[in-house]
Amino acid sequence: DERSLGRQGFWKKVVIFAAGSFMNFLAGFLIILAVYSGAQGFLIPAAAGTAPEFEERNGQTIQAGDIFYSVNGERVYLYSDVSLLMSLHQGQPMDLVVLRDGEKVELNDVTWGTYTGTEGETYQGYGVYIARDQIEEANLWTILKTSWLNTIDFVRIVRLSLQMLVTGQAGMDDLSGPVGIVSTITQVGTASETIAAAVENILYFGAMLAVNLAVMNMLPIPALDGGKIFFLIIDEIAMKLFRKKIPEKYEMAVNTVGFVALMGFMLVVTFNDVFKLFG
């Protein structure tokens, strides 16, 4: 059959294999867009100044109204990114870049320690105050922009999570499978003050899950679409170098092993979810 997958060209196969992830990504974006469609405004990731000890320890200061641009090389897209990215480096020096009057200002090796808070209390942190009153008015452009940036932020969260798993900063207890996801959705819904807030929070979680699946499916792991695309690339390279494709039996063997390993991993994660639920 001329329409069978095996008879399609390289790029058409790539598009076919990537289509599922693209639709998941698009679904995540559209859900976030729906959630934000009723927003009145969006918090700007701006600073409200620093603790009294900050300038003495770091040699310079952050002024009220400075916009956070990056934290340790990671771009700040949303208001929530500031505290999230800072929390990943607790106890270690941190590099900050802020925008002041449109110009980038770098603050390297910002010290972690005991600082005075806005109410006079002491706390462990970086001595940076984050503004809560800088708001960007919601309109068609800002809703589209924030929805897109939030979707991209979900992709980064997946990348950072994988990074933490590989480096040992996170373990099996931090992973969730289907049981854990259902449990989280239930918690998100019941913790909300109103039905409208519950629906909004569950939709937000659903959007994050959709983007998560999109990214994970594109990883070059056998049995996933990303693995199939990886094999297509290897085949294409083999054809150009040796005028010969990799035998299909080897690809099938690798995919089978990958599928069994993936199912085993999911089983372990599911058991872990159950133990956490009833433990």
For each feature predicted by the language model, list its residue ranges.
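Internal alpha-helical transmembrane segments
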Residues: 1-49, 255-258
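Divalent metal-coordination and catalytic microenvironments
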Residues: 20, 217, 225, 254
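Hydrophobic alpha-helical transmembrane segments of multipass integral membrane proteins
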Residues: 25, 29, 211, 215, ...
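Functional transmembrane alpha-helices
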Residues: 2-11, 48-55, 113-213, 233-257, ...
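Conserved PDZ fold ligand-binding element
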Residues: 57-79, 151
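Conserved hydrophobic/aromatic pocket- or pore-lining residues that grip, position, or stack substrates
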Residues: 96, 151, 217, 221
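PDZ-domain C-terminal substructure recognizer with occasional recognition of PDZ-binding tails
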Residues: 69, 84-122
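Juxtamembrane non-transmembrane "cap" segments at the membrane-aqueous interface
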Residues: 223-237
